[in-house]
Regions:
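Transmembrane helix-loop-helix hairpins at the membrane interface
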Residues: 132-139, 162-274
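Membrane-interface interhelical connector segments
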Residues: 145-171
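N-terminal, membrane-interfacial amphipathic/helix-forming hydrophobic leader that caps
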Residues: 1-126, 132, 143-144, 257-274
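Glutamate identity and glutamate-enriched acidic tracts
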Residues: 10-13, 99, 152, 167, ...
Length: 274
């Protein structure tokens, strides 16, 4: 009897433990995803590709509707530009949402979707201080330095778009512009440039290196080129704010505030557009 128990226990000890492929895949999927530079560039590619495809599709649709290809009408390039960024931005944010769904809650802080690590009142104070400083520098560059070299009245692409829509009197166009300037645009750009790119670079580089590289990419995505120094200043300030607070919400807040400021300036007709 004792021999039987002994042999059964030995056989149970020697029995191999089978690990199914399902167990391995579950163990692998339970590991949190770590944001990479490759993912950051993919996010930027999705953003620009979405805008390009929407712009092309809308352009061909307008040509088909109005017969502009036969000379019977004209294509409004400013409206195409606004539509492409607006709907392309919505597609980009949808892609970001699928990323969050795919990688789970651990992915949120990696792209800065969390509360600020400093107190709310300090965060708000930083937003307004940086807003004031950057816009003073931007005004100095555009209204003082550029005229010294014979470049007066240079305005940015968004301001050109607003001026055109205002001239046409399109209510739908103005509504679309406001949604783009105050919601979709700031959220999309901050999620992609600060949330994905800067966060990814910061894993491989010192924080300031990540800010500078991201700011160069941000600057290159705006026009005209004469205003690149302004966009670089904005991006460095917003990148520093993101680095300091660890919260994308603060970067989005100052971006919205900046766009709101220029929208008010445009509505009032003040000559400090950028």
């Amino acid at each position: 009897m004792a021999d039987t128990n002994s042999s059964s226990s030995e056989s149970s000890e020697k029995a191999p433990v089978k690990i199914s492929n399902l167990d391995v895949s579950q163990a692998t999927s339970s590991q949190p995803y770590h944001l990479t530079v490759k993912r950051g560039f993919l996010a930027m590619f999705i953003m620009y590709a979405s805008q390009t495809l929407v712009g092309l599709g809308f352009s061909y649709w307008l040509r088909f509707i109005h017969g502009a290809g036969d000379g019977a009408g004209t294509i409004d390039s400013q409206m195409i530009g606004m539509t492409s960024v607006l709907f392309g931005g919505a597609i980009t944010l949808l892609w970001v949402w699928t990323d969050i769904r795919r990688y789970g809650p651990s992915f949120l802080p990696q792209i800065g979707l969390q509360q600020s690590v400093i107190k709310t009142n300090q965060s708000v104070m930083l937003v307004f201080l940086l807003f004031s400083a950057t816009h003073f520098l931007a005004w100095t560059y555009r209204s003082v330095i550029l005229p010294l070299v014979g470049q007066e009245g240079i305005i940015g692409g968004a301001s050109q778009m607003f001026a055109h829509i205002r001239e046409t009197g399109s209510v739908l166009g103005m509504a679309g512009f406001l949604v783009l300037a105050l919601i979709v645009g700031p959220v999309m750009e901050e999620v992609i440039f600060r949330g994905y790119l800067q966060s990814a670079f910061a894993r491989r580089l010192p924080n300031w290196g990540a800010i500078l590289i991201t700011s160069l990419l941000f600057m290159a995505g705006h026009g005209p080129m004469l205003l690149w120094p302004m966009y670089f200043i904005y991006s460095v300030a917003w990148g520093w704010l993101f680095m300091h607070t660890k919260s994308l919400k603060m970067a989005i807040a100052i971006h919205i505030l900046s766009n709101l400021f220029y929208t008010v300036v445009a509505v009032m007709g003040w000559g400090i557009l950028a």
